[in-house]
Amino acid sequence: WEPLPSETQTIHFLNPTDPEGNIYDISLVLQKKKDSSPLATIKCNWFKTDGSGSWEYGVYDSISILNNRIYTNENIRKKGKRIEMTLKDRESQEEMTLSFTPQKDGTCKIQQKGAEELVYSKERTPITQVAAEPDFKQFFRQDSTYLQGYINGYDPRLGFDTGLIYLSNELTREDYPTVIQIAPNGSFSCRFIINHPIESSVVLGHNWIPFYIEPGQTLTMYIDWEAVMARSRARDHYFPIRNTAYMGPSASLSYLLKDFDNLITYRYEDLSKSQKTLTPDQYKEHMKPIIAQWKQVADSVSQIYQPSLKAVHLIKNKVDLQAGSMLFDFLMSRDYYAKQDSTNQALKVKEDDSYYSFLKDMPLNDVTVLANTNASTFINRFEYMDLFRKAYSDQSFSPSDSIDYTYPKKPLLTFLKEKGVKLNKEQEAIRLRQEKLAGTTAKIIMRQLIAENEKMASLYEKEQKLIQEYVALYSEKKEESQQDKDKIFIKMNQKYDFKKDSIIAQLYPTPNPLLWQIAKVRSLNFNLGNIKDSQIAHEYVDSIKQIFTEPFLASEAERVLEKTHPKDRARSYQLPDGKATEVFRNIIKNHSGKVLFVDFWATTCGPCRAGIEATADLRKKYKDHPEFQFIYITSQKDSPEKDYKK
């Protein structure tokens, strides 16, 4: 290799297609002595030492965090053993002064002007004190929330300046991912609206950093990028991201839920192996000691958090939902594996109804499960469990049963005879009887109807063309109105729901549990999409609302109805301010004045690609049209270049 130029002091390795591997600031010169500036002495996170584990201060290169707010570092100076910092609130622009007195043991005495001086530690101490807190009272309460924080070690050269929060309305299956804007100094913030407390995550690349927040709250997070990279280097999904800190009203619950997840891990490898080697009953036995261990851990943690009834409630729900989700997930993919390995005896064994007995111990009537990160998975598995297939099985008849049968005014056998078809004695006898009953409705024994069809089967098979002609000439089926079609659809759904209600009643002691009500709200988008008449749709929603015991479910049902059957169809949508809107407007700016068909898609999304193929003829029709344009938007992450070109 050629020697580097003598003036080169620093080198970087930056890969625009793989920012995770970026390396920068490799120094080729001898480093100066350790930074001994006043800021270097106090730059870190400072935690209370009273047993609460509370993060009170964060001091960094250009910003500081305290009072659940972000401040700009204005000035720092040393006065004897003390270090004084002047800070300016980033929002209100108000200034304040902090005083730091480092101690020999590594702790630090910190004082806000006019407040008591207290001792703080660089390390978060084990929790020994938990503030008393009542259980959830008003769980549903729509309000905005504000998430902010700092990524220590962030540099724009890492190749990203945004993060994501994958938010969802679990009541309606609506997803609304929210962008987190990251400033060059590593601070970040975003605001979003939620309907109830949630456990979610800040997503940076493939790394998910959890948090818990409630409507109306502000939560501040500290993320250590080196800890994120340690997990990435470990190539282990279960490797903990350390040093994360939280500040705000729900900080203690954020710590709790993050740490508790690491105590009740269940690796996918065990699930995958069990699906291929165990029968359903064997898997339930396999899971018993694992779930028992989770519950023991939950009991121990609950003892520490006992003063907070809300914390204890969240702990119990987390164990229950994880256990339930695993028992549901075991049943998935077994049919697929069975097709791959037709000799596997374990895969030939299907679950019986008793497998679902675990549901009686699940919090199906507890709306607070929606705060849990596993809520979406559990509800999805619950509402589509295989046991509900019974509701869709065709009604079977006994040969001795009788049904109402309407005879056509022109019997088929008479039509065939007039066309020159020869009938045998049995067929002629049937024809004469049908002539007498033509146009009437009468009771007929199933056994008799089956016997008659068997006697005419060979004739029907031979005279297919004449039968088609008969159907075209004499079919008396009248054209149904849209209202009739909608009513038939609703009646069919109500029949299935009634059967499912009966199945739920056998599995769970409380009738009409809340999660089953939520499942019915979640199905509204699809059902209302199949009901075209607005009046019928409103009547349908009114009938559904009668079963809801939680008022917020009724209001969400009304909102879905307004979306599918709006009173005012001439509506526009104002795009929210932010980087995403700027990018979108930049994409469409060259098509001003046109009607735009915009499709967001990914190479990994089967329905997306099917939708593109389904509109191929439409694109041909409007190709080069002066007033119409198709725009398809994807990303490098969702559609890698190699797959995109295919």
Regions found by a protein language model. Name each.
Residues 25, 583-587, 596-609:
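Extended hydrophobic secondary-structure segments
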Residues 234-593:
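Oxidative protein folding and maturation machinery
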Residues 625-642, 646:
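Thiol-based oxidoreductase modules, predominantly thioredoxin-like and allied folds used
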Residues 1, 46, 55, 601-604, ...:
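Signature tryptophan residues that serve as conserved aromatic anchors
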Residues 592-596, 626-629:
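Loop/turn elements at helix/coil->beta-strand transitions in domains of secreted/extracellular proteins
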Residues 592, 600-620, 635, 639:
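Conserved redox-active cysteine motifs that mediate thiol-disulfide chemistry
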Residues 1, 12, 16-56:
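Tryptophan-anchored aromatic micro-motifs
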Residues 4, 18-19, 28, 33-38, ...:
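A non-transmembrane, solvent-exposed segment enriched in polar/low-complexity residues
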